[in-house]
Structures are given as structure tokens and as C-alpha cells.
Amino acid sequence: MDFFTDQVKKKFSDKKPESSDPEPNHNKNKPGHTEPTTHKPGHGEPTTHKPVSNTDPTTHRPATNAELMASAKIVAEAAQAAARHESDKLDKAKVAGATADILDAASRYGKLDEKSGVGQYLEKAEQYLHKYETSHSHSSTGGTGSHGNVGGHGGGAGAPAAKKEDEKSGGGHGFGDYAKMAQGFMK
């Protein structure tokens, strides 16, 4: 046990090793990066996730690692809420934007061709999610009172129904089944 506590103390101690070298570049694989890609909100800066996608479809920039992790957290929380049948409490536009960011990163990471194969389906799904995000972003954040969630009745049934369809189709290892599931979730 002493070895473990010594290692923990060493890991979390405030002392930094004495070195005259400048701090190393931890982003060696990314040309032009001299700073780490993590972002810690400053004083007065909001800590909520803002999806990378925006309302202008011509402007598209890749998500940073921190933004992708935040997007993954949003999607995971949405999946948990859907499993608890609480999807009426979700900001579906925010979830759509986060999902689109993850799909974009997957297509870039996998170097998938946007014109053929799975890449074209990823691109279509990403475009659909961005369109959903832009068309529903102002309606889900605006509106106070009981009419803020129009059409939210039975919102949790979309994902389980899509999952049942997926099971009926023989396992559903195709991307089309995932797109159907995402579309069913957004209803």
C-alpha cells in the first residue's frame, strides 16, 4: 500500500521537475499546433458545450478533441435519458449537433470517401442532423411556459422502436439502420 500512496503523492504533487527546457509540444502529430488542444473555461466563460456546427452550412470546421468529448457526453446523456423514457426533457437540436460533430470526426478519422460507400451515408446523416439542428435550435431554446415542447408527446418511443426494427432486419450492421435509429430518436 505504501508504494501506491507514494505514486499517488508523486503524481499529484505541486512540484514540477526542474528543467531548463521549454514545455514540450504535446501535439507533435498536428502541424502548427504549439498549445495543447484542451480548453479550460476562463472566469466568466460558460462551461456548457456549444456544438461545432453553426447555422451557416457553408462554414464548417472540424471539432477539437475537447469538443468531441463534450459531444460524446451529450449523446451519451441523451441515450441514458431515452432509456429512462425522459427524452421530452432533451434539447434535441443540441443532441443533433453533437451527433453530427461525432459523425464528421468519424468520417475524417476513417478517411471515408464522401462520394461512395459508407462515407456518402455518413455525409447524408451529418447533413440531416445539421439541418435538424438549425431548424429546431431556436424552437427548443425559446418559449417559456407549457407550449415550449410542442410535439413532445411520446418522444421516448422513437429509439426503442428503431432498435426493434434493427433487430428484425437481422442484426442491422448496415449504416442505414443507424440512420433510421437516429431519425427515430429525433421524432
From Swiss-Prot:
InterPro entries: Nodulin-rel_1/2. This is Nodulin-related protein 1. The keyword Acetylation applies. The lineage of its organism: Eukaryota, Viridiplantae, Streptophyta, Embryophyta, Tracheophyta. Disruption phenotype: No obvious phenotype under heat stress. Impaired resistance to avirulent bacteria P.syringae pv. tomato DC3000 (avrRpt2). GO terms for biological process: abscisic acid-activated signaling pathway; defense response; positive regulation of defense response to bacterium; regulation of abscisic acid biosynthetic process; response to bacterium; response to cold; response to heat; response to salt stress. GO terms for cellular component: cytosol; mitochondrion. Interacts with RPS2. Prevents accumulation of abscisic acid (ABA) after heat treatment, thus reducing thermotolerance. May be a negative regulator of the ABA signaling/synthesis pathway. Required for defense responses against avirulent bacteria such as P.syringae pv. tomato DC3000 (avrRpt2). Induction: Induced by P.syringae pv. tomato. Repressed by heat stress (42 degrees Celsius) but induced by low temperature (4 degrees Celsius). Slightly repressed by NaCl. Residues 7-48 have a biased composition (Basic and acidic residues). Keywords: Abscisic acid signaling pathway, Acetylation, Plant defense. Residues 1-66, 132-176 are annotated as: Disordered. Expressed in roots, leaves, flowers and siliques. Residues 142-158 have a biased composition (Gly residues). The modification N-acetylmethionine is found at residue 1.
